[in-house]
Amino acid sequence: MKEKIPFYNEKEFHDMVKKTKKGTFSGWYIIDKDNNSVEFSGKFNRQFKLNKPVIPVNTEYVTRKEFNEYKNSNDQRLTKIETTLAAQGEQINKLTQTVEKQGEQINQLVQVVLLHGEQINKLTQTVEKQGEQIKELQIEQKAQGETLKLILQTLQKMSDRLDKMEVKMDKMEVKMDKMEVKMDKMEKRIDKLESK
């Protein structure tokens, strides 16, 4: 990472110019810590006050103090971001665990639903069997109804015959009564004849 550092006096600047052997330079040099090299840019401002360079207006460079303040504020921001990211990571872990638990619950509910589906299928089969049994019973009931009708018709015929027989019996009883009357008369005649 390159760090921008100001010259604190002209001698330091000229020493750096001699080391790098480049033309005229600004009052800033950049140290590349990775390559151990020094770079310059722009024009050198020779106005030094209290061993600090005068930064030209509209310059893109800052003082070491400003740079350190900026760096510190960035470090604080990075720390806050890291803290926030860590908290968000924990929240993500908790959410992941919650999602996994919900996934397990969903799997359990799916199994319950499948079991209910199987039970419903069994109940449907039972209802279908009962429906078939009801149809068979209805057929048997119809057959029994027809048999009962035949029996009732037979009984009705027998009842009609019995009625006819009763009528005949009544007629026979009437005839028997008449015959008894005749028999009584005959007995009386016989008695009369015997008494003579």
From Swiss-Prot:
This is UPF0134 protein MPN_501. Pfam families: DUF16. Gene3D superfamilies: 6.10.250.40. InterPro entries: DUF16 (IPR002862). It comes from Mycoplasma pneumoniae (strain ATCC 29342 / M129 / Subtype 1) (Mycoplasmoides pneumoniae). It comes from the Bacteria. Belongs to the UPF0134 family.
